[in-house]
Structures are given as C-alpha cells and as structure tokens.
C-alpha cells in the first residue's frame, strides 16, 4: 500500500490547486484522474473554455471544421499546461479509476493493474455528470448528445434540437445558430428564464427568436427514437425531427464510481456529498470540493472551495463557506446576461425596503459605438441601508461589468457611491453612474 499525506481524486480546479500547493510545501501528494482528456478539470476541457472558444470562433468567418479545430487546439494546449504545472510541483499523478475500499483507503485501477493508496487527508474532486432523464430512448438513440458530445461533432447538423432551456442549452442554441444550424429549444418549464428579471428574460427571448432560434415552453417529452439517422422527439402533442439532439437537463454530482457505500461518507437528499463549512465530510480528514459537494456548479466556486480547504489544512481554518458572499453568474447568450444578488421579486418577497431602476443599452453611447443596442441594465437597492441588493446586466461585456457590482456588494459600498464614480469613456460600465442614480 502506498501512503501519502494527501490524495486528491479528480483533476478539477480545487483539487489540482490544492495538490500543487501542498506538494510545493513538501507534502507527499497523489492525484488520481481517470481520463487524460480531463487534466485541468471540466472547465478547461469540456466546459467554460471550449464552449466560449467555440462562441468566439463562431463570430469569425470560419468553417464548422475550423471552429472545432480551433477549440481542440486551445483545450489541448491548456490540458497539457495543467498537467505540466501540477507534475512540476512533485505530485504523483495516476491515470486510473479510483474507488474507496474504506474511509481512508482507495483502490486505483489502470487496465489490469491495481494499487491501494491511503492518506490521512483525502479530497474528492470528481465534479458532475450530465443528468440523463428517464425518457425512453434518450440513452439509446443515435445522434443524441450531452454537452460534451455536442462539442465534437464531425459535421454541422442542419436541424438541431435542444432538450432543456437552462444556461447550457441556451448557450449551445446561440452557438449552433451562429454556425448555421436551425435550432429548436424544447423546455419543460412554462416560463423562459424563470430566475431572471422578467423584463430581462423577455428581451432575451425576443432577441433569440429574432436571431432565428425557436423557443418552445411547456414541452412534455414522452419518447426519443430514430428514423434512420434522424432523431425523433415525441411529445404529448407533436413529433419533432432533428439531425441531432442535445440533452441539457442539468448535471448531477459524480459519486457513483467512488463506491462510497464502502465508507461512512454521507450524501445529501439530492445525491451530493454532504460537507460542513470547511468542505469536510462527516468522516474527519475527507473533504469534497467542487460540483460533487452540491454547491453552485461554477469553476470559480471550485476555486473558492480550495481556499476553504487550504485555510483549514494549512491556516487557522478561519475562511469557511460561511464567508462566501455574493456569487455572480453569466450566461453567454447574445448579448451576455450576467446577474448577482436578488431580483426585484425576491426583494419584494423578503419585504425589504427597495427601489429599482432599469435603463436600456439603446440609451448608452457605447451601445451606439458598438453597433449593438440590445440589452438593459437593472439594479435593485435597499433604500434604507443604501446597499445594493442585486443587479442584472444584459449587454456586450456584461461578464466584466457584473464583477464591479459584486465587489461593491461584498464590501457594502453604498449604491450612491456609483453616482460619483469616475469611469473611462465611452464604456458600458460608465452607465453605472446613471443606473444607481435612484
């Protein structure tokens, strides 16, 4: 049996960072990753980076094959860089499957070779996998893809169906629409973007439909099957025909390969690994970080989980999940939609003293310079404490602007401060002067 100070299962953001840090400090560290294609984790290889690379490449006058090749070049480069960075710190990297034999012993297997590893500290960083709904034919029909498979098609589908109207589905809808596919999004919910401000969601729906994307709500899928190479999506009322189908019906924590039944590690009702404020499971010394612990599925949350565990293992444990404040998010549709904090309806439900303001991008000089007048800014503020309660930024570059607002919220900077903040001109960010003049 091989003994380590730290074993990390999974090459994701939190795990790889922790492994490198502790190895650099002289600890004996092992990192186990079952797929060489996943060095660096989901974001680098099959998530944020390749999908945003595809979006940028789609804006250029490239063929479908060139767009895919561009994505593969960038992800391959970053994959190799991540491996080299971690290996360079002295971490023992095992390309193998890993599962638990007991609370502190894991077995790894590569082909026919098996090894047992043990450590007082084990970090589970296995991420999440696509949630396959129990729809007849979904898992067995050909030309049906998850969010990984849809990034690696050999040819552009003339007609693409997307099952699910969440962030992943809508981002791929915009991408493949730009590439030239006729895209139809079929969503089981009766409301488009239910977590967004209704006025912003209405604009997003309008723009996507103007761009040629068909958006269908309240769809009840009963079966998926093939007619030759075509995919037939059967609903209660109609049958839709596609050349390819993407199912984007959420992602769930990747716990099944771990064989946690051999341990005392507890799961939540939703199947995630249960953790405390230090990301530690109920088994002392065993931690779960990133998507597998049931938190928000963003790579920057995984990075913050690293900070929490590192504080516990190396520092005084003072930084915990309880210190995590406002978490911004961006959906990379066209234009990008970014949000942080509360919506107006949430503020009303909490019976807070609030005020709102919304201004269209069409009223912003930079929008005219960019030649793109689509979108709007909306803010929700507390009229008594002067705190910013939330904001929705729907415009080109919103993914950058939202971070300015998040910093202000985390540091309780009064919204009135923005009315006198000096911004460069012409920018979209300068319109925060007007947005917060409430």
Please identify what each model-predicted range represents.
Residues 40, 73-79, 151-152, 157-161, ...:
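Rossmann-like dinucleotide-binding cores of NAD(P)H-dependent redox enzymes
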Residues 92-95, 99-110, 117, 180-277:
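A Rossmann-like FAD-binding core segment of flavoenzymes
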Residues 4-6, 11-77, 175-195, 325, ...:
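Beta1-alpha1 glycine-rich phosphate/pyrophosphate-binding loop at the start
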Residues 48, 126-182, 186, 214-215, ...:
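Glycine-rich dinucleotide-binding loop and its adjacent helix/turn
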Residues 2, 42-116, 195-222, 344-346, ...:
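N-terminal Rossmann-like dinucleotide/flavin-binding domain of flavoprotein oxidoreductases
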Residues 140-157, 239-316:
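FAD-site-proximal beta/loop scaffold in flavoenzymes
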Residues 9-37, 42, 49, 53, ...:
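Flexible, glycine-rich terminal cap/loop adjacent to redox cofactors
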Residues 1-12, 156-166:
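Beta1/beta-strand and adjacent pyrophosphate-binding region of the FAD-binding site
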């Amino acid at each position: 049996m091989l003994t380590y100070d730290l074993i990390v299962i999974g090459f994701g953001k939190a795990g790889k960072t922790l492994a490198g840090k502790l190895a650099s400090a002289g600890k004996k560290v092992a990192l186990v990753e079952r797929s060489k294609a996943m060095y660096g984790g989901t974001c680098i290889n099959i998530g944020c980076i390749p999908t945003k690379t595809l979006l940028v490449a789609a804006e250029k006058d490239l063929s479908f094959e060139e767009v895919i090749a561009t994505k593969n070049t960038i992800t391959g480069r970053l994959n190799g860089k991540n491996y080299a960075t971690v290996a360079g710190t002295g971490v023992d990297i095992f390309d193998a499957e890993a599962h638990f034999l007991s609370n502190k012993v894991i077995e790894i297997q590569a082909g026919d070779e098996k090894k047992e590893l043990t450590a007082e500290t084990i970090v589970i960083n296995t991420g999440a996998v696509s949630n396959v709904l129990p729809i007849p034919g979904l898992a067995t029909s050909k030309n049906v893809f998850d969010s990984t498979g849809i990034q690696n098609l050999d040819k552009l589908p003339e007609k693409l169906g997307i099952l699910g109207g969440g962030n992943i589905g809508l981002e791929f809808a915009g991408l493949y629409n730009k590439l030239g596919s006729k895209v139809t999004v079929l969503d089981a919910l009766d409301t488009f973007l239910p977590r967004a401000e209704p006025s912003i969601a209405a604009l997003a729906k309008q723009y996507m439909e103007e761009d040629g994307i068909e958006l269908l709500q309240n769809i009840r899928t009963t079966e998926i099957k093939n007619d030759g190479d075509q995919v037939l999506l059967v609903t209660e009322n109609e049958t839709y025909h596609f050349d390819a189908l993407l199912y984007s019906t959420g992602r769930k924590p990747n716990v099944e390969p771990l064989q946690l039944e051999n341990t005392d590690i507890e799961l939540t009702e939703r199947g995630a690994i249960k953790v405390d404020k230090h990301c530690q499971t109920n088994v002392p010394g065993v931690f779960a970080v990133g998507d597998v612990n049931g938190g928000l599925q963003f790579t920057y949350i995984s990075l913050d989980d690293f900070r929490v565990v590192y504080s516990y293992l190396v520092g005084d444990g003072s930084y915990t999940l309880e210190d995590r404040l406002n978490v911004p998010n961006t959906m990379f549709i066209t234009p990008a939609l970014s949000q942080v904090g509360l919506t107006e309806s949430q503020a009303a439900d909490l019976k807070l003293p609030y005020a709102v303001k919304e201004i269209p991008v069409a009223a912003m000089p930079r929008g005219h310079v960019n030649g793109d007048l689509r979108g709007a800014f909306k803010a929700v503020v507390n009229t008594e404490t002067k705190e910013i309660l939330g904001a929705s930024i729907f415009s080109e570059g919103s993914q950058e602007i939202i971070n300015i607002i998040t910093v202000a919220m985390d540091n309780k900077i009064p919204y009135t401060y923005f009315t006198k903040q000096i911004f460069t001109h012409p920018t979209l960010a300068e319109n925060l002067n007007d947005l917060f003049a409430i």
